Amino acid sequence: ERFWNLWIDDMVNRQVEAVVYMFDDRAFKGGNDALQQIAGFKFLVDAILNRQYRYRNWKARRKGKKYMPKLIMLVANKADRFFDDTAALLWQQDRIGEHKIFDPFRDDLIRLQRGGVPTRRSFMATRIGWNVENTMVDLLTA
């Protein structure tokens, strides 16, 4: 939480084209971990849509006023914990955005889409190496 401003500053200063926001199943279970994950994404969305960045100098201010990432990818990590028959069916039909794991972020995803920022969603399980490369390639080729 205390580093969120620094992430936004770095993202704007480097003019990052693609943003990956990774979360895990704790966002769906509730508690303080869920609050941190959901609030972090909301902070990111608010900063992008409202262009509320801290500016260190005039050049950064000029760059920041025009900045908008080309893509935001929301990635649900630890898929080995929540991947069930419903997830498999949605995966086959290329409709993973409808999975319940993305429900806590749905309102902010809609806000991004209304603001003209393309979004993608994906699953991965980094611990076992499932779908990690495919997700990153998908992000880079979007």
Predicted features along the sequence, with ranges:
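Conserved GTP-binding G-domain of TRAFAC-class P-loop NTPases and closely related GTPase folds
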Residues: Q15-A142
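Switch II (G3) loop of P-loop NTPases
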Residues: E1-N5
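Structural alpha-helical scaffold elements that stabilize or flank donor/cofactor-binding regions
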Residues: M11-V12
